[in-house]
Amino acid sequence: MILETTAKASQQYKVMPIMISLLLAGFIGMFSETALNIALTDLMKELNITAATVQWLTTGYLLVLGILVPVSGLLLQWFTTRQLFTVSLIFSILGTFIAALAPSFSFLLAARIVQALGTGLLLPLMFNTILVIFPPHKRGAAMGTIGLVIMFAPAIGPTFSGLVLEHLNWHWIFWISLPFLVLALVFGIAYMQNVSETTKPKIDVLSIILSTIGFGGIVFGFSNAGEGSGGWSSPTVIVSLIVGVVGLILFSIRQLTMKQPMMNLRAFKYPMFILGVIMVFICMMVILSSMLLLPMYLQGGLVLTAFASGLVLLPGGILNGFMSPVTGRLFDKYGPKWLVIPGFVIVTVVLWFFSNVTTTSTAVLIIILHTCLMIGISMIMMPAQTNGLNQLPREFYPDGTAIMNTLQQMAGAIGTAVAVSIMAAGQHDYMSTVKNPADPAVIPQALTAGVQHAFVFAMIVAIIGLIGAFFMKRVKVDH
């Protein structure tokens, strides 16, 4: 059993309580993040706001993660595991409570930002803790268990919130989450142990400023580009991306010239870590763009209700969650290559089928395709991530997890922005060929055409990942 107590040379960790604390907090955090997505239409009506405005509930969340996660490597070296866990849960509880009571959009946006502070602290802490408390030959299975939570929570989020919205209102999405977060905090206070060493390196303010400008600018720019208000030609988007890229270059130069960098980019001298980062980046682009495109296609192309759309996506998400521990164990036994290559083959084939869906495609077909997509993703994500982190020496763990989690946020922003832009262009091209664009029957067909174009982009990204997968090697851990 993967949650059995494992030992470090000088210290005994109670692995089961630590893992339960992390899994419970992570589950509710990921659930809260995705459960709100299906309520955005209701929020637009109730709060009398536009689509571009309501999108800030997602953009603001991603922006905070994009700024906070890069700093997490420094925080992990300054504060104990218990301190970071407790503070992350307090932020999550406070944000959820404010959201449950929110009388206006401003309050709800503020609540989402506070929630993001909690998630931004928790995600790197989860991965870093696993690297410390589990020996290398058990990390795959442990990462798989974390994967179960990370994938299972978003799977049931839309279905659950669709059910809540049918009988209650969006406030209850937060009220129902609140007691579970409190339970996670109480459990963590009782059982969480300090597993990381607090070396308290010197804080370089300029590094934090450059990191905030660099990562924040890129996430903000891509998120705004995907909202459709001006798109890629918007001055806000162009300036944000330029400032972000310049900030990122200056940040990288400073980190490589410092004796004690905030984020040690020398982790990139390990080839399997680089390849692992690329695989995870591609995987996140595919999965997050698909999570955006499929609900839009199901509701706009096949004209299903929000609840029905959630049910269609439920089997794939659940199976993905349960596949993660299985692929984790297979990784421990066989290494990454024989999981990641077949995984990318499955993902590429499924995305080709998705690029050919029509307004007459059946819900059963979408369930089968989505389930296969999730199986493929589960074969790639955790094995690639674990193999990459395994090559790093112990002192690089906080930096490695910070780099991985930061680039996942960027992948999400980039993947969804490009997918939405391609979808909008595909819709526009289709409408330009129609004799009567005002015909309501044309709208689902136009949206479906846009979705087809966007899935072609996702398929090309997956093919790049497949090529990279052939270069993966199992890391021999000697540290």
From Swiss-Prot:
One of its GO terms (molecular function) is transmembrane transporter activity. It is found in: Cell membrane. It holds the Pfam family MFS_1. Keywords: Antibiotic resistance, Cell membrane, Membrane, Transmembrane, Transmembrane helix, Transport. One of its GO terms (cellular component) is plasma membrane. CDD domains: MFS_LmrB_MDR_like. It comes from the Bacteria. One of its GO terms (biological process) is response to antibiotic. The keyword Acyltransferase does not apply. PROSITE patterns: MFS. The keyword Cell membrane applies. The chain crosses the membrane at residues 19-41, 56-78, 85-107, 112-134, 141-160, 170-192, 205-222, 232-251, 272-294, 304-326, 338-355, 360-382, 403-425, 449-471. It is a multi-pass membrane protein. Proton-dependent transporter. May mediate the efflux of lincomycin. Belongs to the major facilitator superfamily. EmrB family. NCBIfam families: efflux_EmrB (TIGR00711), MFS_efflux_LmrB (NF000060). This is Lincomycin resistance protein LmrB.
